[in-house]
Amino acid sequence: MSDTMQLDSIWHNGKQYRKGYTTGSCATAAAKVAALMVLRQQVIDHVSIVTPSGVTLRLNVEQPLIEGQQATAAIRKDGGDDVDATHGMLIFARVTLCDHGEIHLRGGEGVGTVTRKGVGLPVGSSAINRTPRQTIEAAVREAIGPLRGAEVEIFAPEGEERAKKTYNGRLGILGGISIIGTTGIVTPMSEESWKRSLAIELEMKRSAGAEKVILVPGNHGERFVREQLGLDGQLVVTMSNFVGYMLQEAVRLGFRHIMLVGHPGKLVKVAAGIFHTHSHIADGRMETLIAYLALMGASQELLLEVSHCDTTEAAMELIAEHGLQAVYDRIAERICERMSEMLRFAVNPPRCDAIMFSFDNQILGTSRPLNDILEAMR
């Protein structure tokens, strides 16, 4: 781990949980220091980066090497107390200076290759997600200045073996790990502590007088609510995978209007009565889509194609090709019904709504006419 890292620990029920950093942060730091070393022609043993969440990391550099106009460096992944398949492995970057003025990024040994649609990256590309791509390119550009160019390769010698312990294979990402992380920071907690920390935000908003709340799975949902729906971000609370728990907490606290907003990859599960959406607990995404497509008269051929999809995005592409996007409204309506069924024993049952959106921020389905929902939420 780094010798100095501006990360706070988390305390829950008297226990301290140590934060860590993502493979994306490792790749960004490795690329930055490799670029600096090739420019200065000098080995560097520490590097600092600012993560997308605004946290500054100062990390140890391992295996630095300079060879003419090329340098290589590695950062060791540390997930804190959230130990996953990539914990402890080295993430390398190799940077070669060029005269073309552009930064070209690719994955090398141990970084997976995308072989199927539906993961948000082009088929055939390296499994380096959008945010890490941006932070890597920005860090290298900062290091080399506006005029130089660079070829940047991210690689992880242990990646192919470590990836066998992840879901990459099921998603069609083959040959290695993914370079991921939207915030750059790993925040570990036990599930109960995590749920409780989410509920605390609900309590804070209710105590401040809020009667309406929008529950989202994560950061993307919050941005969508603010930027696409034009609603106050103060209405938003993250629910993660704990849909049922957060609904019950919201009712217990007295919220009068509860809305779920998220990508179908999470929310279609709720239409099937699944209120804990982590893939380790339950899935049912394709089965739910197939059921509602069948009710709309979809062909047997389409239903079979959807059954073979590994991701919701892949199924959504098929649905669009067949012009059956109206299925999302039906699913959103059923989500709303499921919410109401769960909360029917409340003394004052709340109004429930649901909105689903795509990764490119298009509204897919709503439980009621959109204007009615937005007016009620404002």
Swiss-Prot record:
Keywords linked to the UniProt accession: Cobalamin biosynthesis, Methyltransferase, S-adenosyl-L-methionine, Transferase
Classification via Pfam families: CbiD
Keyword Methyltransferase carried by entry: yes
Segment forming the signal sequence: none
Transmembrane region(s): none
Known EC number: 2.1.1.195
Gene Ontology biological-process annotations: anaerobic cobalamin biosynthetic process; methylation
Highest taxon of the lineage: Bacteria
Molecular-function GO terms, alphabetical: cobalt-precorrin-5B C1-methyltransferase activity
Pathway where it operates: Cofactor biosynthesis; adenosylcobalamin biosynthesis; cob(II)yrinate a,c-diamide from sirohydrochlorin (anaerobic route): step 6/10
Enzyme class, spelled out: transferase
The reaction(s) this protein catalyses: Co-precorrin-5B + S-adenosyl-L-methionine = Co-precorrin-6A + S-adenosyl-L-homocysteine
Family affiliation: Belongs to the CbiD family.
Protein name: Cobalt-precorrin-5B C(1)-methyltransferase
